[in-house]
């Protein structure tokens, strides 16, 4: 829709079944507490299967053994994924030791998975361990509230280890925004923490009785790093500093990457600039954006319910004016900002506070003791002696933050001894995948298990063409929901079927352009053949400093996506 012909503010029609479920759930309680005591099944039944998502969990099963169990007349091996709420990715070493122990003692896979939304997940929690995991988190000051389903999810914040003062201020705002937008229901405390039911009725002044129409994602960004991939998110606060101090934010609204194969009403979209706001209006504006989306978002069709679609339907100016009205402010013109990169600086960086920060590359964020590389043990040993904190990055890496000079050698020795500082190529550092098989029920093709060997082959192509130290931002996502953020990559692979992917090209290094589909439903050999040819051309024909994605657009190999609502599928 253009601004001249905006659509209706509210979509009329039969509400989706998810809306019924939320309304009937008694503020997210459902019958989860009763279901916990049902030992006949390893899963949650009926509405509870979806309601547990509001409590930070997804019900999954091991798809590698699904058919085998069906043959044996057994139900799937149900287990939960739990995702922690961790604004800005900051976790204390005490908390880390607690989650390390839980992963080892109480999960099927024994691993900790860092996510590209700056938190960690446990995979493979059996039903009997579901309540204990929430209680363990609570005992160390953590929770899993609102990390899934139709709420404001984990709030991201640039992991900038260098500008310590600015990071500290931005991180405080990420925490404040997260707290302000949390659900107020007491369901979480009652079910998991055995807190008394109180006689007062629940109220949700911001989210409402049926919560948001769809998931909602928020970031706080410190330029020039776009490590948190702001354009994947509904609401983004871009930090504006004067003399190293935070003074306000530019607001960008309506980013999002999820699509559905073949559904032309769905598209990936970059966020739109609304304007600048001084710090004191931050929470009012955050609330206004969320409540506008709450009231105007499409509750009849979940595939069309995210903020990006609301913005396109009602028109950017209409949405922006409503946010101004609700927040009681007028946006100032956007202040200048620019992004220069989004990868993590692997290795040691000295902050302006003279403390050191060690960024460790964790391939696909999977922390486990591998043969010859006991990563999980290494991080536990570091956590036992480190006085600072850990920070999870949006690139699925881990920062050992605020290391004094006196501890630097000791921590480096532990990291090296446990394979945490093994040299990897620039290409590997800039490649990322979602979890996908065997645990994700939506997976159509491999992602995390596919990427390491696929990266080997791309490294060989770079070597063949004489550019082994170059890198291309490369992402693999197992389905079009897009958790791997392939829709902001220079090379994006989107799972279509086992062993088959759609190949997208034409994003850029800084994550401000959506890549277009180049080839559909192709196998790994076909993908590699295309990349061999195109990387060969890039190596020969590129301009100074020109990234692969920019080259594919300039050379006419792919047309850039300029207006996704209209040209994403062309």
From Swiss-Prot:
Keywords: 4Fe-4S, Amino-acid biosynthesis, Cysteine biosynthesis, Heme, Iron, Iron-sulfur, Metal-binding, NADP, Oxidoreductase. One of its GO terms (molecular function) is NADP binding. Belongs to the nitrite and sulfite reductase 4Fe-4S domain family. It catalyses: hydrogen sulfide + 3 NADP(+) + 3 H2O = sulfite + 3 NADPH + 4 H(+). It is an enzyme of class 1 (oxidoreductase). It holds the Pfam family NIR_SIR. The keyword Nucleotide-binding does not apply. This is Sulfite reductase [NADPH] hemoprotein beta-component. Pathway: Sulfur metabolism; hydrogen sulfide biosynthesis; hydrogen sulfide from sulfite (NADPH route): step 1/1. It comes from Salmonella dublin (strain CT_02021853). Component of the sulfite reductase complex that catalyzes the 6-electron reduction of sulfite to sulfide. This is one of several activities required for the biosynthesis of L-cysteine from sulfate. GO terms for cellular component: sulfite reductase complex (NADPH).
């Amino acid at each position: 829709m253009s601004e001249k012909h905006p659509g209706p503010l509210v979509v009329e029609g039969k509400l989706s079944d998810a809306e019924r479920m939320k309304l009937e759930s008694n503020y997210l309680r459902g019958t989860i507490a009763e279901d916990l005591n049902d030992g006949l099944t390893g899963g949650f039944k009926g509405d509870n299967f979806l309601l547990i998502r509001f409590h930070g969990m997804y019900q999954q099963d091991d798809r590698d053994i699904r058919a085998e169990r069906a043959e044996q007349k057994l139900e799937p091996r149900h287990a939960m994924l739990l995702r922690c709420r961790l604004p800005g990715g900051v976790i204390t070493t005490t908390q880390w030791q607690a989650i390390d122990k839980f992963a080892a003692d109480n999960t099927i896979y024994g691993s900790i998975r860092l996510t590209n939304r700056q938190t960690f997940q446990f995979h493979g929690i059996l039903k009997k361990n579901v309540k204990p995991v929430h209680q363990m988190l609570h005992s160390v000051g953590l929770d899993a509230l609102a990390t899934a389903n139709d709420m404001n999810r984990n709030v991201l914040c640039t992991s900038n280890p260098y500008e310590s003062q600015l990071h500290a201020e931005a991180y405080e705002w990420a925490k404040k925004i997260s707290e302000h937008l949390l659900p107020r229901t007491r369901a979480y405390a009652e079910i998991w923490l055995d807190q008394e039911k109180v006689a007062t009725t629940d109220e949700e002044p911001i989210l409402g009785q049926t919560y948001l129409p769809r998931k909602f994602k928020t970031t706080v960004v410190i330029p020039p790093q776009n490590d948190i991939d702001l354009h994947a998110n509904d609401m983004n606060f871009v930090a504006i500093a004067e003399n190293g101090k935070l003074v306000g934010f530019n607001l960008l609204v309506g980013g999002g990457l999820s699509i559905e194969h073949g559904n032309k009403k769905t598209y990936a979209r970059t966020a739109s600039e609304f304007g600048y706001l001084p710090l004191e209006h931050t929470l009012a504006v955050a609330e206004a954006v969320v409540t506008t989306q709450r009231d105007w978002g499409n509750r009849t069709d979940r595939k069309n319910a995210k903020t990006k679609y609301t913005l396109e339907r009602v028109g950017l100016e209409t949405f922006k004016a409503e946010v101004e009205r609700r927040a009681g402010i007028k946006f100032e013109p956007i202040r200048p900002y620019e992004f220069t990169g989004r990868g993590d600086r692997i290795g040691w960086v000295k902050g302006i506070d003279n403390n050191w920060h060690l960024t460790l590359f964790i391939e696909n964020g999977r922390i486990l003791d591998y043969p010859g590389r006991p990563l999980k043990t290494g991080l536990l040993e570091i956590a036992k002696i480190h006085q600072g904190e850990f920070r999870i990055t949006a690139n699925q890496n881990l920062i050992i933050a605020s290391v004094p000079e006196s501890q630097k050698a000791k921590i480096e020795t532990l990291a090296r001894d446990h394979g945490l500082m093994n040299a990897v190529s620039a290409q590997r550092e800039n490649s990322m995948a979602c979890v996908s098989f065997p645990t994700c029920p939506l997976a159509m093709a491999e992602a995390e298990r596919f990427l390491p060997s696929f990266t080997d082959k791309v490294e060989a192509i770079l070597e063949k063409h004489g550019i082994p130290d170059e890198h291309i931002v490369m992402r693999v996502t197992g389905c079009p929901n897009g958790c791997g953020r392939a829709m902001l990559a220079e090379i994006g692979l989107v799972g279509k079927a086992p062993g088959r992917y759609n190949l997208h090209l034409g994003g850029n290094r800084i994550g401000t352009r959506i890549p277009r589909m180049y080839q559909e439903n192709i196998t790994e050999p076909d993908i590699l053949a295309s990349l061999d040819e195109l990387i060969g051309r890039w190596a020969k024909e590129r301009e100074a400093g020109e990234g692969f994605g920019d080259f594919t657009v300039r050379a006419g190999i792919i047309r850039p996506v300029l207006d996704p609502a209209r040209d994403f599928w062309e």
